[in-house]
Amino acid sequence: MHVAAAAPDKLVDETRELAAQAHATGHPDALVGGLDPNEDLAELERQLDEQLTTKRFRGIRIMGEGDHAIPTPGILQALQDRGLLFELMVHPDALAPAAAALAGWELPVVVEHTGWPRSNDPEEHELWRAGMADLAGLRANVTCKLSGLAMPMQSMAAATFAPWIHHAIELFGTDRCMFASNFPVDGMHGSFDDLYTAYATVVAGLDDDARARLFADNAERLYRLD
């Protein structure tokens, strides 16, 4: 599973290259592309349609800060009309505004990087808790991707991850959460095995079915990894 890199002028090229790679190697099994929200809607729709020419394309995320990364109604309509998902990547101070913008839409939404906190600061944590509660309360089609914690926490320790992951699962439930990595960025703080060992430690108290949902089943369903 591949999610778009931060290359706003090469987003369609990236999807095209990944489609060729998948044809040759079988991987990635699915991909999330990107859009530049500064483009007019007709151009955005053209870019979506071009990326849809690969059967592995599942949706888009927008890279940016604050309101820039919150999709407009036009973008959401274009995605919904095409059966695509939207991956939300904003910091805690933009989670509540994002929830307001997403209210009422039926397309699948993925909250990336566990709501993307910037630090373990108590004020950041409170902003995060409030915004995540707003997003979790929208609808059953909003999922939390449990990822992206190693960089802001500068650690892959299970004890560091636990408060964030436990609260996200409390809000969204194990039916609407899934583990993911943020490699290669996560690699500054440990290995892939370190990351998933920490995840496994954090949820060791859950039953087998719940862990299966977090580590595989939910992602397979959402991204249609069949």
Annotate each language-model stretch with its function:
Residues 1-10:
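Glycine-rich, proline-tolerant flexible connector loops at the mouths of alpha/beta enzymes
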Residues 9-94, 100, 145-150:
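Active-site gating/metal-coordination segments in enzymes
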Residues 11-29, 162-170, 195-202:
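Short, electropositive alpha-helical surface patch
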Residues 18, 31, 79, 113, ...:
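Conserved, mostly hydrophobic/aromatic
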Residues 39, 116, 185:
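Short, glycine/acidic-enriched loop or turn micro-motifs at the edges of active sites
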Residues 69-178:
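Catalytic pocket-lining loop regions of alpha/beta-barrel enzymes
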Residues 71, 75, 84, 107-110, ...:
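A generic "structured core" feature
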Residues 167, 171-178, 187-226:
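Mid-to-C-terminal alpha-helical segments outside catalytic/metal-binding sites
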